[in-house]
Amino acid sequence: MLRRALEEAIAQALKEMGVPARLKVARAPKDKPGDYGVPLFALAKELRKPPQAIAQELKDRLPLPEFVEEAIPVGGYLNFRLRTEALLREALRPKAPFPRRPGVVLVEHTSVNPNKELHVGHLRNIALGDAIARILAYAGREVLVLNYIDDTGRQAAETLFALRHYGLTWDGKEKYDHFAGRAYVRLHQDPEYERLQPAIEEVLHALERGELREEVNRILLAQMATMHALNARYDLLVWESDIVRAGLLQKALALLEQSPHVFRPREGKYAGALVMDASPVIPGLEDPFFVLLRSNGTATYYAKDIAFQFWKMGILEGLRFRPYENPYYPGLRTSAPEGEAYTPKAEETINVIDVRQSHPQALVRAALALAGYPALAEKAHHLAYETVLLEGRQMSGRKGLAVSVDEVLEEATRRARAIVEEKNPDHPDKEEAARMVALGAIRFSMVKTEPKKQIDFRYQEALSFEGDTGPYVQYAHARAHSILRKAGEWGAPDLSQATPYERALALDLLDFEEAVLEAAEEKTPHVLAQYLLDLAASWNAYYNARENGQPATPVLTAPEGLRELRLSLVQSLQRTLATGLDLLGIPAPEVM
C-alpha cells in the first residue's frame, strides 16, 4: 500500500527531527495540489514552530519514495503528488486479503430468542455482524462467528407452553417459526396470561434441565432458513442450557468472589445477594452495585453474560461441541453435552447487540477488569446499534406488530422483479437477479449508516438504482462486467497513455484497502459501504465523461494501448466492487 509506505518514510524523517510520531496520510482535498497529504498542526507545540515551517522542514529532510513525484507544502500540510505510472501499477495490482496475523476474534451476532420468526430489528444485527466478521477476516484476522441460543429464556418457555396449551397443530405449510410466533403472540394477548404463570414456570424449569431441546431446535432450524437466505455465515452455536450444564456460571462467580469488589452484604436492600461494585472501573454511577446472584440463589442475566464472556476469552473452560445437523451450513458446530471439549480463547470479542444493552455490556467489561483481566476488558467490544423502522413504523414482537424478515425479503424480491423486468425484459434469469437486487437493497441499507443512528427502511428508496443504495453499487459492477464481456481478451496496457480521467479513477481504486482497514479498526462496516458508493460514483463519472459533446473515455473503441489500459482499469474496478460487496455479504450480479 502506497499510503503505508509513505507513512513509514514520514515517520523516519520525523524521528530524525526529534519527534517519534506516526502521522496518518490521507487523500488531499480536490481543490488542493497533490494526491495525498499529512497534517502537521499536532507537532507545532512539541517542535515550537508554526505548522508551515514544519511542512517545509519535513519536505527538505524527507527522502521521497520512488513512487512520489513531488512534496508540496500547503499551509500546515505537506502534500504529495504520486507518479502516474506508479499510481496506475498499484491500482491494477490484483487485490488479495491481508496476511494472516495470530489471535482469534470472536464475533457474536444474531442471537435471536428461539421462539418466533426473525423481525426487521434483527436484520440490522445480522447485517452488521456478518459484515464486520467478513471485513476482519479479509483484514487478516482469524474470525469465529458465534450465534447464542437462549433456550432457557422466558420467551422460549412461553412459546413452547403456548403451543401445548392451545393444542396447536402445525399443518406444514407455514414456516414453523411463524407458526410458533403466532402462539407466542396469542399467549400475550390472552386475558388469562397472569393466571398461567405457574404452568409457564414449569416449562422454564424443564428447559433449564436441558429438556425440550428438540422442540426449541425445530424453531431454530426455521429461523436458520431465514439467516441463510440473508447470506449470513456462522461457525458456532452455543446453547444456554449447555452453559448451565457445564457450570460456567458457578465457576465465574467463584472467580469473581476473589475480588474485594464482589461481596455479600449482610444488611440493606442487597442483603444476602452477591453484589459487584463497578465503581473502580465505571466511575460516576449513581448506584455502583449490581446483583450477580439474588438472595434466593437465582442468577441475574448480568451474571450469565459475564460467565459466557469469560468462556469466550479462555478464562473458563467446560463447553463441548459437535457437528450440527442442518441443511444450510455444512461446517457449523453446536455446543452439546456429548461433544468434544473446545474453548476459543479469543484475543478479542465483538458482541453485536442493540444500543439498549450498552449498560450490561459495560458491566461485562467491568467484571473482566475486576476479576484481574483488565487487558482483556479492553478487547471486549460492544458493537451497539440503534433500532430499525419499517416505512416509519416501530416494531413490537410481543404485541404482534413486527414485520418478519421473511416478509421483507419476499416483498423486496417482488418489487425487484418488477424493476428488473422493466429495465431488462430479456434478462436470462429474472428471478435470480431479483433475489440478488433485493438482498443488496436490504443488507446495504442496514450497514450504510453509522450503527448508532436509527434507520428507516423504505422499499422504494432501498431498491433504487440511483443514490446511496446497494442496487446502485451492484449496477455499477454489472456495467463494468458488461464492458469486459464484450471486450474478450486484451494485451498489455500502455500506462504512458493515461489521461487525467484514468489517473482520477486509479486514485480512487487505491482507497479500497484503506477503507477495509479503517472499517476493521473502527469495527463498523459503514466506512466500507460509503467507499463503495464513492467508487461507484467515480466509475459512473468516468463512464459518462464528455468533452466537446463527445464521450471522453470510450473503452472498447479507444486507441491501441489506451484501450488495454482502460480495460485493465475497468477490470480492477469490477473486481474491487465485487470484493467490497462480498465483504458486506451482498452478491455482485454480472447482469442487471
UniProtKB/Swiss-Prot annotation:
One of its GO terms (cellular component) is cytoplasm. Transmembrane segments: none annotated. Its main location: cytoplasm. It is an enzyme of class 6 (ligase). InterPro entries: aa-tRNA-synth_I_CS (IPR001412), Arg-tRNA-ligase (IPR001278), Arg-tRNA-synth_N (IPR005148), Arg-tRNA-synth_N_sf (IPR036695), ArgRS_core (IPR035684), DALR_anticod-bd (IPR008909), Rossmann-like_a/b/a_fold (IPR014729), tRNAsynth_Ia_anticodon-bd (IPR009080). A motif ('HIGH' region) lies at residues 112-122. One of its GO terms (molecular function) is arginine-tRNA ligase activity. Disulfide bonds: none annotated. It is found in: Cytoplasm. It holds the Pfam family Arg_tRNA_synt_N. SMART domains: Arg_tRNA_synt_N, DALR_1. GO terms for biological process: arginyl-tRNA aminoacylation. It catalyses: tRNA(Arg) + L-arginine + ATP = L-arginyl-tRNA(Arg) + AMP + diphosphate. Keywords: Aminoacyl-tRNA synthetase, ATP-binding, Cytoplasm, Ligase, Nucleotide-binding, Protein biosynthesis. Its EC number is 6.1.1.19. Belongs to the class-I aminoacyl-tRNA synthetase family. NCBIfam families: PRK01611.3-4. Monomer. This is Arginine--tRNA ligase. The gene is argS.
